[in-house]
Every structure is written in C-alpha cells, then in structure tokens.
Amino acid sequence: MSWQAYVDDHLMCDIEDHEGHRLTAAAIVGHDGSVWAQSATFPQFKPEEMNGIMTDFNEPGHLAPTGLHLGGTKYMVIQGEAGAVIRGKKGSGGITIKKTGQALVFGIYEEPVTPGQCNMVVKRLGDYLLEQGL
C-alpha cells in the first residue's frame, strides 16, 4: 500500500458512524520534515515549524508558551501525551499529531468533527505504523 493510500483511506475517510464527517486535512511526514503523503488540503509548512514540533516531542512543553504553528496557522497547545501525541486547538477546529518511530501522522479538523474523533483517527493509524516498526 502506498503512503498516499494510507492518507486517503485511513485519515481522510468518513469517521466511524458519522457518514460525511471527515478530517479537513491530513499527512504523514518523516521526522526530517519530508512529506511521505498528504491530502490536497494539507498546509504548506515551513522547516522551522516542523523543527518546533519535533523539539516538543523530545522536550514536552516546548511549544506551550508560543503555540504550535503549521502552515502559518497558530494552534493553542492542549494536553497531549508527552513524547507521543501533540494536540492543538484553534477556534472550532484543531490538530492532532502522533509520533511513530519514523514519522509524524497529522490530522486537522473543523466542526462538526470533534477533537476526540480526530484523535481516534490519527491514533489508530499511528499505532498501526508503530506495530509495523515504522
């Protein structure tokens, strides 16, 4: 299966029991900032934004004072899982980032998708990639 198929079939799919509800954007990005696959709507990010995200995984709390920036959009960092998941909120939407051994799985959402639904979709694929040694 191609990386693009993982994004299309496992991240940008309808959310379980909520037909028509799906993430706004999603991507799988290597720890080095290289894009493995992304939805057409995933924002163009700057290298320093990815560096900040990777630093927060290694030093939890790094982004809390300044916020998480992706594609020029600022998200307020909310409780995640230290070293494993970063969550951000902006208005009625937000972002979840799950770290695997080699990649970061991104999910961006807006209402009517809930933070919990975004977390579930991103975590499910991230956990699968971890099980596969990725």
Curated annotation (Swiss-Prot):
The keyword Transport does not apply. It is found in: Cytoplasm, Cytoskeleton. SMART domains: PROF. CDD domains: PROF (cd00148). One of its GO terms (molecular function) is actin monomer binding. Phosphorylated by MAP kinases. Keywords: Actin-binding, Allergen, Cytoplasm, Cytoskeleton, Disulfide bond, Phosphoprotein. Pfam families: Profilin. GO terms for cellular component: cell cortex; cytoskeleton. Signal peptide: none annotated. A motif (Involved in PIP2 interaction) lies at residues 84-100. The modification Phosphothreonine is found at residue 114. Disulfide bonds join 13-118. Binds to actin and affects the structure of the cytoskeleton. At high concentrations, profilin prevents the polymerization of actin, whereas it enhances it at low concentrations. Occurs in many kinds of cells as a complex with monomeric actin in a 1:1 ratio. The variability of the residues taking part of IgE-binding epitopes might be responsible of the difference in cross-reactivity among olive pollen cultivars, and between distantly related pollen species, leading to a variable range of allergy reactions among atopic patients. Belongs to the profilin family. This is Profilin-2.
